Amino acid sequence: MLKIRLTRIGAPKKPCYRIIVTEARSPRDATYTDLVGTYNPMTNPETVVINAEKALYWIGKGAQPTDTVARLLKKAGVVNSN
């Protein structure tokens, strides 16, 4: 089963995340199938960059976003709030 989730990058105490598509059983920082976007919580306001076309493609293929990624997708306007 595929998941759309965050993988951590960045320096210690300065997190930045990639939004990736990967197998649900793989470790957090393992290799990934596709890069969908980035999320930087350290900027004010926090920065979310998502390739909507890729995100919708993978959701259409059955990839399940995690709760955090689902919130980010709604915030970016990629998916409905329903």
UniProtKB/Swiss-Prot annotation:
PANTHER family: 30S RIBOSOMAL PROTEIN S16, SMALL RIBOSOMAL SUBUNIT PROTEIN BS16M
Keyword Ribonucleoprotein listed: yes
Signal sequence segment: none
One GO location term (cellular component): cytoplasm
Name of the molecule in the record: Small ribosomal subunit protein bS16
Molecular-function annotations in GO: structural constituent of ribosome
Annotated family: Belongs to the bacterial ribosomal protein bS16 family.
Coiled coil: none
Keywords: Ribonucleoprotein, Ribosomal protein
Gene Ontology biological-process annotations: translation
